[in-house]
């Protein structure tokens, strides 16, 4: 897409999220296996070209030393690539692997993890509250000059991008790649009931860990146990990924995405038959939600199409047609119906965020108001 369009979409999305959500939190409130921070706290802006970045990572080929590891006992191997490590902004290592669950730290006794360790590399993080990833210790030792503890990381899973931090290392024998905290793993794959002894086995997850001191989440947003300001995590993540996208020339035919984020207006559609400001997302393109479509197009039956009655939406990426696991994943008055954000005139309000209809539960006490726990989900 043209640079102005990318900048406008990204800037507006950040402005909406930053002012409307304000995720400064008391981490202990979310230190629960089924009550961690909701996905919206650490999901990338919908303006980030997630699919294009994932495709670029799949083409990476530069292999540094100490970079190849199995993804499990006796399994295939994954290689950490350094194609992006030399950029002046948005520098990062990347790799593709599966996703096992790491509960080291505060929650070392999580389900399926009887032998967890009480500490993580730079503290004792809560695996229930902090979305973090794990890197093999040998690779960390070989790259201590660039890989920093608590550096921002991005994970692409199930077609979505989530931000976290590089919070722990793997010193097992053999050392493996493809490991993330309880929160990150269960956010990526909410229907798989992942735990310390059950991981996502397909090697289809893209991991990106940013390098250098400027990529480290500051102490104002993090303590030894919890992330305390998710706004900072999201803002840094979008900025770093925006810089990476620019370096990879992923802005589309008209230019590159910006490295600095400023508030600008979304340009009006150019009008006319066949006009479209976001190449690849025009009428007829495949889509999963309205946010996959350019300008005023909407996602109808999996295809971007014109719809003069398109509704407004204050939370980009969570509009009508977006995938969801609970009502809290949907904007405004939309409800999560059969995994899709949809209009429901009978939607009831929910006062306990993360415990609304569709949320995971183990008992009725995990559900808001008059909802009940049925088959592991809060239901009316």
Swiss-Prot record:
User: From which residue to which does any coiled coil extend?
Assistant: none
What's the record's remark on domains? The C-terminal R3 domain contains 3 tandem repeats required for the binding to insoluble chitosan.
The root-end lineage is: Eukaryota, Fungi, Dikarya, Ascomycota, Pezizomycotina
As its record notes, the protein acts as a catalyst of: Endohydrolysis of beta-(1->4)-linkages between D-glucosamine residues in a partly acetylated chitosan
Keyword list (alphabetical) reads: Carbohydrate metabolism, Glycosidase, Hydrolase, Polysaccharide degradation, Repeat, Secreted, Signal
This protein is called Endo-chitosanase C
Q: Name one GO cellular component term.
A: extracellular region
| Xref: Pfam families | Glyco_hydro_75
Show me the R repeat boundaries. Answer: 276-304, 311-341, 348-378
Q: Which InterPro entries match?
A: Chitosanase_fungal
Task: Please describe how the activity of this protein depends on temperature.
Answer: Optimum temperature is 50 degrees Celsius.
Any idea of its EC number? 3.2.1.132
According to its UniProt entry, the function of this protein is described as: Chitosanase catalyzing the endo-type cleavage of chitosan, the deacylated form of chitin. Chitosanase may be crucial in the degradation of the deacetylated portion of chitin in the fungal cell wall. Chitoolisaccharides produced by the hydrolysis of partially N-acetylated chitosan are known to have many biological activities, including antibacterial activity, immune-enhancing effects, and elicitor activity.
GO MF, one example: chitosanase activity
Kindly indicate whether the keyword Signal belongs to this entry. yes
Q: How does activity depend on pH?
A: Optimum pH is 5.5.
Q: Where is the signal peptide?
A: 1-22
Name where it's found: Secreted
What Gene Ontology terms for biological process does this UniProt record contain?
polysaccharide catabolic process
**Family per record:** Belongs to the glycosyl hydrolase 75 family.
